[in-house]
Amino acid sequence: MGDKTKVQVSKLKPGRYIIIDDEPCRIVNITVSSPGKHGSAKARIEAVGIFDGKVRSIVKPTSAEVDVPIIDKKTAQVIAITPDTVQIMDMETYEMFEVPIDTGVAEEIRDQLKEGINVEYWETLGRVKIMRIKGEGE
């Protein structure tokens, strides 16, 4: 995949996504400060990694451009669950994925996963993460 695009720092908002240290992250907080008469305003961006949950922060001029991941949100069915991985099948392309449980499944749904249920998964930068369980008819 590796899909990403460039966005100006001044256009970013909390809740959007950014790539920091080659890791797609969700922006939690942005603070902008003006240094004074000369020089451009700087933005401090705090974000949490989608896959690893680590908090990262960067400081950039508001006029700078940063990489933003293109996230594909799709539906899949859980085919099999092993102690280390979950095997899912995309409902449109029937493509199969092996997703590691520790980094590829959102913590709050790990206990609720069962074979045969539908889940929403995100695919970005060649990685897959199961984000939530989909209800009937979604």
UniProtKB/Swiss-Prot annotation:
User: Where can this protein be found?
Assistant: Cytoplasm
One GO term under biological process is: positive regulation of translational elongation
Q: Which GO terms describe its cellular component?
A: cytoplasm
The record's principal subcellular location, in a coarse class, is cytoplasm
- Keyword entries, A-Z: Cytoplasm, Hypusine, Initiation factor, Protein biosynthesis
Q: Does the keyword Protein biosynthesis apply?
A: yes
Name the source's superkingdom.
Answer: Archaea
The record, for Gene3D superfamilies, names:
2.30.30.30, Nucleic acid-binding proteins (2.40.50.140)
Question: What CDD domains does this protein's entry cite?
Answer: S1_aIF5A
What protein am I looking at?
Translation initiation factor 5A
Family affiliation: Belongs to the eIF-5A family.
Function statement: Functions by promoting the formation of the first peptide bond.
| UniProt cross-references to InterPro entries, sorted A to Z | IF5A-like (IPR001884), IF5A-like_N (IPR048670), NA-bd_OB-fold (IPR012340), Rib_uL2_dom2 (IPR014722), Trans_elong_IF5A_hypusine_site (IPR019769), Transl_elong_IF5A_arc (IPR022847), Transl_elong_IF5A_C (IPR020189), Translation_prot_SH3-like_sf (IPR008991)
